[in-house]
Every structure is written in structure tokens, then in C-alpha cells.
Amino acid sequence: MKKLLIFSIITYLLVTINSTADNQNSNENISEDEKILKVGVLLPLSGKFENIGQSLLKSIQLGLFDIDNKNIKIYPKDSKGNALDAYLSAKKFQEMEIEIVIGPIFHESLERLDEISNITFISATNKTQEIPKNTIAFGINLDSQMNTLKKYFDEIKVSKTLLLSPRSDFNYQTESIAKKDILKFYRTYSYDSDPKKITGEIEKITKYRERKKDLERRIKILEKSELDKDKHELKKLEQKHTLGKVNFDSVFVVDFGERLKSVLASFMFSDVSSEKINFFTLNQWFDNTLFGENSLRNLHFPSIDYDNLKKFEKRYFKTYNEKPNEISILAYDALGLIYYCWSNNNFNFKIDQLFNKNGFKGLQGEFIIKDNLSLQKLKIYKVAEKEFIKVY
């Protein structure tokens, strides 16, 4: 197996700094100016998304502190969360001869960045369509999630998976999942986005009323029998809500938040148990509100390395006395990636290094950058009573 290029700042970079001391001595003829690594930071530092932008900026500053190299300089600019201001700030980076920028966050802000030459942008977006040629989509994208789920599906041998998504919402994700054809779905359904109507639609999908009537008919037959075996069966059936199995073995729900909870609760009310049927969804960023509800037990989702995320969040909180935005760890990793490439190329940053075919390992886990996407080797977690358990 080819060795991964590891750049995890906390564990690796400090070693790298020490181990490169000899190289620095042998390159004393290189001027200090040539050793400077200038990194642009393009985030929404004001406006509606200011809190997200400030959280990512603090993560980058935390990474800068951990690297502890005075020759790395960051230059933050405000994208204001829109394409025009992102473009205008990028033009200023161009004037400053900055070649690498962390940001923007949102896909909408990338609109005009392909007009900026000689700069590569590492964006936190998880969308993969219409990415400018000078931009790397560094978010936890569908490709990575589907590839990981495919491997897990093969391992646990599910073959009849339902794909469910709300009408009108998350069209991008649902259409992308279908087009990629990585996962094979037994049937595809869409449901009303109104939580009050979801239960009725799930009942139809699971044929709840038919299964309930089958139970009632069977009970009536058994009630007329005097046979011991029928009486024994009757006692068992009286504890049930339906009779018969559903015609699927797994469900993949493209949803989030309260509506996701409503969908899973509706399956439970329709007498479809998560102990018998596997339930999956997209990356939930370890949302603690998933705890405490029986219908969410054993819900599975792909995500980054949870242990590393908890360590990062603890370190961030200790430094800033506040919780980071969940995607802040990506900004931390982005700086580590840039530093790794720079320090391992005689303090000369080259864009081609980002596309190393052996891949990298950050706090988020292993990944490789290919076709302007960060393809992550994710893990699968399931929701337990008060914890997330890694199952793959």
C-alpha cells in the first residue's frame, strides 16, 4: 500500500518543522521573502453568515498557532457571502500575488472566480457541480458519502433499498445521487415537506393498512379455533400491530433536522422497526439532537473521523470559549494541507502538489484531491442512545 502523505498539524507538523531544520540550513541562499507563504482567506466576515466565517477564521488562526512558523502569513478578506464581493476580494489577492486561498464557503460565491487567474481556491462547499477549474471543493461531498455507503452496503449485503426525499427540497442532492448511480435503489419515493402529512405517506409506502388488515383477519380466524397451537399463535399476534414483512431491507432518507425525525418516527408508527430494517441518511455532523428518540436508534450516516472532531472541538473551545461551526475543521485541515505542500517542496508552494495521487490525511481523515474534488475516505456511524458508534 502506498504511504499516505500525512499533514495532521497537531501530531505531524511539529515533527516536520524540526526535521526540516537541516534543509533550511542548506538553503540559506534562499531569501527570506522567497520563504514566505502567503495564504489568502476569503470568508463571510460580516452580514448574514458572519458567525460561520468568523468560526472558520478562528480555526485557521488556531492552525497557524499550532504550526508556529513565522513565515506563514494569512490575509483575511470579507466575501460577505455573495459572488460579487468574493470576486472583488479575489482581485485584491491577485494584486498581492497570493496564489492560494482558503474559501469561499458557499457554492454561490464561486460564480466568478474562474475569471481570476493564477489563484487556487480551497472552498468548503460540498457541492460538486459547476466547480471553477481553479477551485477545489473541499467539503464532505456526495461522491465521498455514496462511495463509502456503497462499500458498507456491500459488506452488510442490503439489496432492496428505498430512496426517500422531500418534494422540492434537496433536489440537488437527490438528483445527484440518482445520476451518479453508485447506489442501486429498489424504489424511489418523494414525500410532502409538511411534517403533518408525512405519516400518511409513509403508511402508503410501507403498506401499513394492508398489513394491519392482514393481522385483523388472521386474529378473527384464530379466535374461532380451539386448537392449542392456534391459541398460542393468537397470543403472539395480539401483541403485534401488523402482520407480514415489508418488501425492502433498507431505507435511505435524504433529509435533515426535524423533518428527518418525522420520517423515521413515521416508519416506527407504521410498524417498521430499525432493528430489522437498516436506515441511512447523509452526513449529519454528529447532531446531538438525534439522541433520545427511539425512532432514531440505529440510524446510520457517513461522516469524518469523530474522535478527531471531538479533539478539535475541545481544543477550539479551550482557546475561544465557544463551540466551532461544524465545518471549521475543514478550514483547519486546509491550512495544514497548504503548509505541508509548501514545507515539503523546499518552501516553494506549487499547486500540482495538491493533486498528489497518494492522497493525504488530516483531522477529517484520509482524502485525495482529484478532478477539483476532495474525495474523502469516510466512516459510517450509527445513532445509539447517547452516543455515535462507528460501525465501518
Q: What is each of the regions a protein language model found here?
A:
Residues 4-392:
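Extracytosolic ligand-binding ectodomains
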